[in-house]
């Protein structure tokens, strides 16, 4: 297959992400509400699970990138002692209040538990990996079909110094570790694998695959746990996924935005009040949604219009 990774975003009509095509597979109506190519409506309040995940991601980004940079500046031999010292030094400079400000009390406990227990893992990683970038935006232009573009953000790109290979980290905070069967078909991991093959080739290095870095959201050391899975799909799996994604992308482009009628999907959906009001009717504009739904307790609007900026690439 031909891939295009221009540094400048193409003017593709249809823009997708792993999350968006996953949403479409669950419920095409939900994708219609959320997609920035369509209604671009978001719930105004972030869920607690999203808030803690965002805070942990930001903390990991700061710790990994700053400690790795410090080690390189000092021409470190990357011994565990030097890596631990660098991590401790960076940790001492960080004001955690900036990460905690958006969290409720329970999630503050979870955040503190994670940062206390995961800190040693950062030092261990830095003995093997050099951090090349965190929160790295990418895009796949005219892929998997012409006039469609997939975009995303790699949590962390590292160089495995021993293997001389590129690896991508995907950090996940979770209540329970994901079953292996889910990861086998994970849309996000497959898309990252596609990008990783070309990224590593451009760097004239081997592609080492992806590291799914799962961190349990425990409030105490007893509830905390950490688990990793390594993924590098075969060429056959790579091609099979490409054909699957092509079919799903074409279906999404031609969708009539039907509701899913799935119990658990509807129960957990932020957009349930909209469907409850409109039924099978498809609202035509974001204005009628933003203006129509107000929280009875707070008096605040429940949804906001969140269009894509013209130069956005993430």
Question: PLM features: what roles do these ranges have?
Answer:
Residues 1-26:
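Terminal, charged accessory segments of proteins
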Residues 16, 51-55, 110, 184-187, ...:
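Generic recognition of stable, solvent-exposed alpha-helical segments in well-folded globular domains
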Residues 58-137:
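A non-catalytic, helix-rich entry segment at domain boundaries
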Residues 6-13, 29-42, 94, 168, ...:
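Short amphipathic alpha-helical segments and their helix-coil junctions
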Residues 130-247:
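Mg2+/Mn2+-dependent nuclease catalytic core
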Residues 25-36, 72-96, 209-225:
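Short, compositionally biased low-complexity segments
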Residues 18-68, 108, 112, 135, ...:
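Nuclease catalytic cores
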Residues 1-3, 147, 162, 235-314:
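Accessory terminal regions of nucleic-acid processing enzymes
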């Amino acid at each position: 297959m031909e891939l295009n990774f221009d540094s400048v975003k193409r003017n593709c009509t249809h823009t997708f992400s792993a999350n968006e095509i996953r949403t479409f597979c669950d419920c095409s109506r939900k994708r219609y509400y959320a997609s920035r190519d369509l209604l671009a409506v978001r719930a105004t309040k972030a869920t607690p699970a999203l808030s803690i995940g965002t805070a942990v991601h930001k903390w990991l980004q700061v710790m990994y990138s700053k400690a790795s940079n410090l080690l390189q500046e000092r021409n470190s031999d990357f011994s565990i002692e030097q890596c631990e010292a660098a991590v401790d030094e960076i940790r001492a400079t960080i004001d955690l209040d900036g990460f905690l400000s958006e969290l409720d009390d329970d999630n503050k406990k979870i955040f503190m538990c994670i940062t206390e227990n995961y800190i040693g893992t950062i030092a261990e990683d830095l003995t093997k990996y050099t951090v090349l970038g965190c929160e790295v935006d990418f895009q796949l232009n005219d892929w998997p079909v012409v006039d469609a573009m997939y975009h995303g953000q790699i949590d962390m790109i590292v160089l495995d110094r021993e293997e001389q290979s590129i690896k991508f980290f995907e950090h996940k905070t979770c209540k329970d570790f994901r079953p292996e069967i889910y990861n086998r078909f994970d849309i996000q991991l497959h898309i990252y694998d596609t990008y990783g093959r070309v990224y590593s080739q451009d760097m004239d290095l081997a592609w080492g695959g992806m590291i799914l870095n799962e961190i349990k959201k425990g409030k105490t050391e007893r509830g905390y746990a950490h688990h990793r899975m390594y993924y590098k799909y075969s060429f056959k799996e790579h091609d099979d996924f490409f054909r699957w994604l092509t079919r799903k992308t074409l279906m999404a482009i031609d969708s009539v935005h039907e509701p899913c009628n799935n119990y658990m999907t509807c129960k957990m959906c932020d957009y349930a009040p909209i469907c409850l009001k409109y039924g099978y009717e498809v609202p035509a504009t974001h204005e009628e949604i933003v203006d129509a739904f107000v929280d009875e307790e707070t008096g605040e609007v429940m949804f906001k219009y969140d269009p894509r900026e013209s130069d956005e690439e993430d």
